[in-house]
């Protein structure tokens, strides 16, 4: 009897989905839930604070985004996170020159940071420098292959730069990584149009 109860509990526990990560919440368009999940942790790592800032931007909550970017900007002098925060705040303010300078410094400080490359891509995209944006997002995706939105943004930038060969690769990766993303229908439509099917 005891064995049967333990087996039932084990099967029930195994069948339950673990609490989704802030990244998975973000990738499924649950931006407020992603924000709340990060806020629950006062010691949240910088990559999650950055994700929180991006989620605020998706919800057009620019003041809250600036708070999150501001906490990153409080990182030690010379760190990539400090520059990412500064770039994010400048981008929210529409100061593209300052955003570009800070993003470039973030990449110089830590060229292996997917988030630094992603931030650079956001700035290049805002400046309508699509080939440079595509290269930055593609590098972010290379550095962190699980970063779904790096694939999405690379695909969009390649699409705008009329490089549909590269666009398709990044969009396919995005669709695999973020199957519940709100951008999924638009990506599928673009892929269908480009492929003529």
Where does each model-flagged region fall?
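Structural signature of tandem alpha-helical TPR/SEL1-like repeats
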Residues: 32-33, 59-68, 92-105, 127-139, ...
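N-terminal leader/linker segments that initiate helical-solenoid repeat arrays
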Residues: 7-51, 58-60
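Start-of-helix register in tetratricopeptide repeats
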Residues: 47-50, 81, 115, 149, ...
């Amino acid at each position: 009897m005891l064995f049967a109860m333990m087996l039932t509990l084990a099967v029930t526990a195994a069948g339950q989905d673990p609490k989704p990560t802030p990244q998975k919440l973000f990738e499924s368009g649950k931006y407020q839930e992603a924000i709340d999940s990060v806020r629950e942790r006062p010691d949240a790592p910088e990559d999650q604070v950055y994700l929180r800032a991006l989620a605020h931007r998706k919800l057009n909550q620019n003041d809250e985004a600036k708070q999150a970017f501001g906490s990153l900007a409080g990182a030690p002098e010379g760190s990539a996170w400090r520059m990412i925060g500064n770039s994010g705040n400048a981008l929210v303010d529409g100061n593209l020159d300052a955003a570009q300078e800070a993003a470039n410094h973030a990449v110089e400080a830590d060229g292996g940071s997917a988030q630094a490359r992603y931030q650079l891509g956001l700035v290049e995209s805002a400046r309508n420098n699509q080939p440079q944006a595509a290269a930055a997002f593609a590098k972010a995706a290379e550095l962190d292959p699980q970063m779904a939105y790096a694939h999405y943004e690379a695909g969009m930038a390649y699409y705008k730069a009329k490089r549909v060969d590269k666009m398709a690769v990044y969009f396919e990766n995005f669709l695999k990584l973020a199957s519940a993303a709100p951008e999924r229908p638009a990506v599928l439509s673009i892929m269908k149009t480009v492929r003529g099917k």
